[in-house]
Amino acid sequence: MIIENNKKKALEKALDKIEKQFGKGSIMTLGENRSMDIETISTGSLSLDIALGTGGLPMGRIVEIYGPESSGKTTLTLEVIYEAQKKGKICAFIDAEHALDPIYAKNLGVDINNLLCSQPDNGEQALEICDSLTRSGAVDLIIVDSVAALTPKAEIDGEIGDLHLGLAARMMSQAMRKLAGNLKNANTLLIFINQIRVKIGTIFGSPEVTTGGNALKFYASVRLDIRKIGTIKDGDIIIGNETRVKVVKNKISAPFRQAEFQILYGNGINTEGELITLGVNHNIIEKSGSWYSYNKNKIGQGKNNACNFLKNNPNISKEISRKIREINLIK
C-alpha cells in the first residue's frame, strides 16, 4: 500500500513537472482526451462513408487516395471539397499537376470563388504552402494533386537524365514529420492524391507501388485504392464509370471494406443511384419487378426513372439517406 502511494505521488509530481514545462494538456489519460471524438467530412459517396465506418474522412489526419489514371481520384477529392464547403469549411487545392479544370469543379458543385488554389513550381514549395496553410489554423481541408508531381527543386534545376535517387522520398519523409503534428493541432484534413507504378522484377505479391517512398503510407490514417471496374453506357455512348474503392488502411475503424458506385462524366458521383441500391439492400425502398416504391408509393419504373424522381425530390432523398445512415450507425 505504501509502495502504491509512493508511486502515485511520484506520478503526480512527474505530471505536474511536464505540464509546467510543456503546458496544460500536454499529458493526460486517454479517457480525458476528447480528441477521440473524431470529426469527419463526407466523401460524397454514401457507400464509401459506410465502408469507412465513421461517416467520412477524419479531420486532423493525413489521407492518401491512389489508383490508375482516369480512375476518379480527382473527382472524389472534388466531391469531398463540395461536402466540406457545404459545412462552411475553408478548402485549398495544391495543383502540382497544373491540370485542375475549374469548369468541371464547378459542375460538381464546388464553389470555385471560395476555393484557394496554388500551382507551385516544385515539391518543396508545395509542401511548404501546405504547412503554412495548416499552421494558420484557418484552412480546414487541403488537397495535394499529386504526389508524383511533387518534383524536388534539385531535379528541376538539374539536367534531364541526371540521377536523383531518393530525393522525392526524403522530401516526403521530412514533410510528413513536420506536417503530422501541425495537422492534428489545427484539425486540418490533408488529402494526397497519388499515382501507381509497376515495380519491375516482382515475383510474389502485387507489383504495383505508389510514388513518393514509404513515409506517406505510414503517416496516412486512411488509404483508399480507387479503380474503374466497368463503364456505364447510354445506348452506344459511354457516359460514366463503375467505380470500386477499397479501404486499404484505416486507423479510425475497420480496414479492408469496399464500396462501389458510379461516376458520371461531367456530374460526379451518382448519389441518387447509390440511394436506390442501398435503399433496396436495407429494405427502405421496395423493388417489385422493374418498379421501385418508397413508403408504398411508386417512385419510378426502372432505376433511371427512380433516380430522376429522387433528384427532383431532394427532401425524400435526404430522408432515405438519413435512414440508411441510422442503420449503419453513421451520424
UniProtKB/Swiss-Prot annotation:
It is found in: Cytoplasm. GO terms for biological process: DNA recombination; DNA repair; SOS response. ATP binds at G67, P68, E69, S70, S71, G72, K73, T74. InterPro entries: AAA+_ATPase, DNA_recomb/repair_RecA, DNA_recomb/repair_RecA_CS, P-loop_NTPase, RecA-like_C, RecA-like_N, RecA_ATP-bd, RecA_C_sf. One of its GO terms (molecular function) is damaged DNA binding. Can catalyze the hydrolysis of ATP in the presence of single-stranded DNA, the ATP-dependent uptake of single-stranded DNA by duplex DNA, and the ATP-dependent hybridization of homologous single-stranded DNAs. It interacts with LexA causing its activation and leading to its autocatalytic cleavage. This is Protein RecA. It comes from Wigglesworthia glossinidia brevipalpis. The gene is recA.
